[in-house]
């Protein structure tokens, strides 16, 4: 109920009475001028007492009184409706809400039903309008235009024209037409050429051009070529990382005008820088500095053999060379020149080693009397074979080191998250966070060694290896029993290992697994010196002296001989073997030199045999009567009698031992 | 880098140096340790203060410890020297307290190659606060291995300070590695004590 100018009270069809009333056509209208409260009474003093209008609850109460409740609910039903069986409700007539009734009564729509219908419709229309607006606002399906907006046709912008598919097709067609024209022209020319057999000037020029470009392409497979304006130039420098196309190392490329008598020359003419117009070679060798080689170490200043340099008079000859050769030689010259310069600079920095540089020859002290010699040789810039001088192995190693140096990145590349360019090795990256102290930082800061230092190591090792193979050859040649065989176990650039194997022919069956300790020994070679090592781990340092190496090998042979004697005396097929009384591998002779010895005794205990093996000399054999009782012995009866070794029966040591043991078995 | 024991000495640095030279120590060089507290601009209990330290033994490192009640609860970190530069950018949260900075400068002696003893004078600003001795046993980084030997060493050389052990010696029972941060924790404790001293 709303207060307004017109107070309308529609009738609510709640009770039965009201439904049965006749349908009225009009509506009760009560017009009041304002919504003053009704005056109940006016007091004598002029105070008006108002009749308070009904509140909602009052109004509901008034209506509720009009309803005949007993008719609705029924007298029999209990107060609480919830326990009532829903079936019972059907007995009541016209229950207010939700009741099934046989008599279907069309509900009266009421006087405002059409208004409601129109309002509902307009509400629906508004809802759909709202939907449309929201759709247009959030999507691109429709664009809202005001009534006054002119409808413009969008002109195609240059962008849209270019991305338009139609235009692209047009361009493709135009390009294809151009290609067709070119091919047509080519076809015509080819026909003309085939009919003329290619003698027109045009065709010759065309041939030359194609030939030029083909050869240029060949050249570009190996060399860096660049076009600057109208000139084509190439680069002779060999660095992978660093500046390229540096002025001193570029060569010009031009087209040679072919005339008829130069058929075998290439159409590309290159002009190599004049100072690189020679062939070079860097020879490395190990030389000995003694009186005889005095003048041979350096070059004779009057000798012109390796000192070629470019002269203007040679320019014609140079022009006749094929670019493949001349560029290769020129780059090699550049490379070797730079390497020699670097090596000389490094040599000057090495303060502890003496070095002399003169006339493109560098001599640096290796060890003892030996020097390492680097010589840069120049040869004329023409075809022909150049004899390789110096030690071929060292030449190759030097070449490999140069290339390895060029390929090594000393600066770490930048990574995905940009990191600073740094020289420090990766192992030092966490030196701050790891709390490394100074000693640890130094340890991890591995610095690269120069080529010269590495060459020195390799060359000294090579000299020592040559020396040891020499000694091994001598040892194996002179020793008859035991026979010594040697082989390389490990050959490296700065360390190698050689194994010596000793055997006695015809007596191998006596060598069991026990004796393998004595029958094998090794020589370890580093770049500083040689060390002879026995299988049970005893090392004999031989520095760089070949005599000492020989001595060590011979000592090992003596130890082996002792073992042979003891093995043979035990494993004899004779019924009565000999007894080893004592054996000493570390014994010394009167002069203090090592002389392993062994004393045997026969089974009958009548004789003692003493073998003394001196290093590098014939063994000595002594015999005496066996001392039965130390206290009662008479020294003159038990003197050692030396036997003449060379007159013993048998060719080798083992055979002599065999024969001797047989003889002394029972005597 | 070995197990280290840092303590405050009650004698002058010179007397300690003379003592070391008498038992055969060789002067190795100089060292410097500095301890700088960093505080928030307005003192508050929510934001704790941080202490940044450097030690010349680890020249590329910076140590940062936020001291709380116990050793295990204090956040500690080792970083490279760039940390100092970063800290200057964080001046809205942490400001260096240069008045409270303590520097320990002195000499280091090496004894028979295994022991490194550093003796330094601790100064705060211009006032000298005390003398600090650091004993490092290089070969071992396991505390329980060399704890007893170090106590014996201190007893035999100084005869005075061997009773108060550093915290790390007391709390470590298992064979754990000793790190540079443990040394700096000891320095932190000593620096705090020195700051309170007048």
Swiss-Prot record, chain A:
Q: Which Gene Ontology CC terms are recorded?
A: core mediator complex; mediator complex
Compartmental location: Nucleus
GO biological process, alphabetically ordered: regulation of transcription by RNA polymerase II
Coiled-coil region(s): 172-197
Write down the superkingdom of origin.
Eukaryota
The reply to whether Coiled coil figures as a keyword in the UniProt entry is: yes
Write out the GO MF terms. Answer: transcription coregulator activity
Give the main location: nucleus
Keywords of the record, alphabetical order, are:
Activator, Coiled coil, Developmental protein, Nucleus, Transcription, Transcription regulation
Per the entry, what this protein does is: Component of the Mediator complex, a coactivator involved in regulated gene transcription of nearly all RNA polymerase II-dependent genes. Mediator functions as a bridge to convey information from gene-specific regulatory proteins to the basal RNA polymerase II transcription machinery. Mediator is recruited to promoters by direct interactions with regulatory proteins and serves as a scaffold for the assembly of a functional preinitiation complex with RNA polymerase II and the general transcription factors.
The record describes its quaternary structure and partners as: Component of the Mediator complex.
Q: Would you identify the family this protein belongs to, as annotated?
A: Belongs to the Mediator complex subunit 17 family.
Q: What is this protein called?
A: Mediator of RNA polymerase II transcription subunit 17
Native source species: Caenorhabditis elegans
UniProtKB/Swiss-Prot annotation, chain B:
Keyword Nucleus in record = yes
Indicate what this protein is called per its UniProt record.
Answer: Mediator of RNA polymerase II transcription subunit 20
- KW Nucleus (keyword) present: yes
Q: Identify the domain of life.
A: Eukaryota
Q: Where in the cell is it found?
A: Nucleus
One Pfam annotation, family name? Med20
**What is one process in the GO biological process aspect for this record?**
regulation of transcription by RNA polymerase II
Q: How does it assemble?
A: Component of the Mediator complex.
Show the taxonomic lineage. Answer: Eukaryota, Metazoa, Ecdysozoa, Nematoda, Chromadorea
The UniProt keyword set, sorted, is:
Activator, Developmental protein, Nucleus, Transcription, Transcription regulation
Q: Identify its protein family.
A: Belongs to the Mediator complex subunit 20 family.
Which GO cellular component does the record give, naming just one? mediator complex
Q: Provide any one GO MF term from the record.
A: transcription coactivator activity
Give the InterPro entries listed for this entry. Answer: Mediator_Med20
What job does this protein perform? Component of the Mediator complex, a coactivator involved in the regulated transcription of nearly all RNA polymerase II-dependent genes. Mediator functions as a bridge to convey information from gene-specific regulatory proteins to the basal RNA polymerase II transcription machinery. Mediator is recruited to promoters by direct interactions with regulatory proteins and serves as a scaffold for the assembly of a functional preinitiation complex with RNA polymerase II and the general transcription factors.
The disulfides recorded in the entry are none
């Amino acid at each position: 109920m709303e207060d307004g100018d017109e107070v309308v009270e529609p009738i609510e069809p709640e009770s039965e009475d009201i439904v049965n009333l006749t349908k009225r056509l009009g509506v009760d209208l009560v017009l009041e001028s304002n919504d003053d409260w009704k005056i109940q009474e006016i007091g004598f003093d002029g105070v008006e007492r108002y009749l308070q209008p009904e509140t909602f609850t009052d109004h509901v109460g008034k209506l509720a009184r009009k309803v005949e409740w007993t008719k609705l609910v029924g007298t029999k039903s209990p107060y609480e409706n919830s326990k009532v069986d829903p079936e019972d409700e059907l007995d009541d007539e016209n229950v207010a809400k939700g009741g099934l009734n046989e008599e279907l009564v069309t509900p009266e729509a009421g006087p405002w039903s059409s208004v409601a219908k129109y309002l509902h419709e307009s509400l629906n229309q508004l809802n759909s309008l709202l939907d449309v607006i929201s759709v247009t606002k959030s999507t691109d399906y429709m664009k809202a235009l005001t009534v006054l907006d002119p409808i413009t046709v969008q002109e195609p912008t240059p962008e849209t024209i270019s991305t338009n598919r139609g235009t692209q097709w047009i361009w493709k067609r135009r390009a294809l037409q151009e290609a067709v024209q070119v091919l047509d022209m080519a076809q015509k020319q080819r026909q003309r050429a085939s009919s003329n057999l290619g003698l027109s000037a045009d065709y010759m020029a065309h041939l030359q051009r194609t030939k030029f470009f083909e050869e240029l392409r060949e050249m570009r497979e190996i060399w860096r070529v660049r076009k600057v304006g109208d000139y084509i130039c190439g680069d002779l420098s060999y660095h992978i990382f660093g500046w390229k196309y540096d002025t001193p190392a570029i060569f010009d490329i031009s087209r040679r005008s072919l005339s008829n008598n130069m058929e075998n020359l290439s159409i590309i003419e290159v002009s190599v820088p004049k100072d690189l117009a020679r062939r070079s070679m860097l020879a490395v060798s190990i030389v000995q500095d003694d009186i005889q080689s005095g003048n041979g170490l350096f070059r004779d200043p009057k000798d012109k053999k390796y000192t070629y340099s470019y002269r203007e008079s040679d320019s014609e000859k140079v022009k006749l060379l094929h670019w493949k050769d001349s560029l290769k030689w020129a780059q090699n010259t550049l490379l070797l020149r730079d390497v020699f310069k670097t090596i000389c600079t490094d040599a000057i920095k090495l303060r502890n080693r003496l070095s002399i540089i003169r006339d493109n020859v560098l001599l640096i002290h290796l060890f003892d009397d030996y020097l390492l010699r680097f010589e840069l040789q120049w040869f004329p810039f023409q075809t022909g074979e150049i004899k390789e001088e110096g030690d071929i192995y060292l030449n190759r190693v030097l070449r490999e080191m140069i290339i390895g140096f060029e390929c090594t990145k000393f600066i770490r590349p930048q990574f995905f998250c940009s990191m600073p360019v740094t020289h420090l090795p990766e192992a030092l990256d966490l030196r701050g966070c790891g709390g490394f102290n100074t000693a640890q930082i130094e340890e991890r800061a591995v610095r690269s060694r120069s080529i010269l230092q590495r060459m020195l190591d390799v060359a000294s090792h090579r000299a020592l290896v040559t020396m040891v193979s020499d000694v091994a050859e001598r040892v194996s040649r002179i020793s008859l029993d035991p026979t010594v065989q040697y082989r390389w176990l490990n050959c490296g650039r700065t360390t190698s290992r050689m194994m010596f194997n000793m055997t006695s022919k015809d007596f191998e069956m006596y060598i069991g697994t026990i004796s393998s300790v004595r029958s094998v020994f090794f020589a370890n070679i580093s770049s500083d010196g040689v060390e002879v090592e026995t299988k049970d781990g005893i090392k004999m340092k031989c520095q760089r002296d070949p005599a000492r190496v020989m001595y060590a090998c011979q000592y090992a042979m003596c130890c082996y001989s002792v073992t042979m004697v003891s093995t043979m005396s035990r494993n004899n097929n004779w019924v009565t073997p000999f007894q080893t009384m004592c054996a000493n591998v570390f014994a010394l002779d009167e002069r203090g030199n090592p002389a392993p010895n062994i004393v045997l005794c026969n089974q009958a205990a009548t004789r003692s045999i003493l073998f003394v093996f001196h290093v590098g000399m014939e063994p000595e054999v002594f015999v005496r009567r066996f001392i039965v009782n130390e206290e009662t012995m008479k020294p003159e009866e038990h003197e050692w009698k030396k036997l003449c070794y060379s007159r013993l029966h048998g060719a080798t040591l083992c055979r002599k031992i065999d024969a001797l043991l047989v003889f002394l078995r029972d005597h | 880098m070995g197990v280290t024991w840092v303590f405050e000495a009650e004698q002058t640095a010179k007397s300690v140096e003379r003592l070391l030279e008498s038992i055969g120590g060789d002067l190795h060089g100089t060292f410097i340790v500095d301890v700088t507290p960093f505080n928030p601009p307005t003192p508050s209990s929510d934001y704790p203060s941080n202490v940044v330290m450097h030690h010349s033994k680890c020249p590329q490192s910076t140590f940062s410890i936020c001291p709380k009640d116990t050793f295990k609860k204090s956040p500690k970190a080792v970083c490279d020297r760039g940390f100092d530069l970063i800290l200057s950018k964080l001046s809205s949260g942490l400001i260096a307290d240069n008045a409270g900075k303590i520097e320990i400068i002195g000499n280091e002696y090496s004894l028979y190659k295994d022991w490194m003893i550093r003796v330094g004078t601790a100064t705060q600003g211009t006032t000298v606060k005390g003398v600090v001795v650091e004993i490092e046993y290089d070969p071992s980084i396991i505390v329980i291995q060399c704890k007893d030997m170090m106590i014996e060493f201190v007893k035999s050389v100084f005869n005075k300070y061997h009773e108060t052990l550093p915290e790390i010696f007391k709390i470590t029972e298992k064979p754990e590695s000793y790190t540079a941060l443990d040394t700096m924790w000891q320095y932190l404790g000593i620096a705090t004590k020195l700051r309170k001293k007048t």
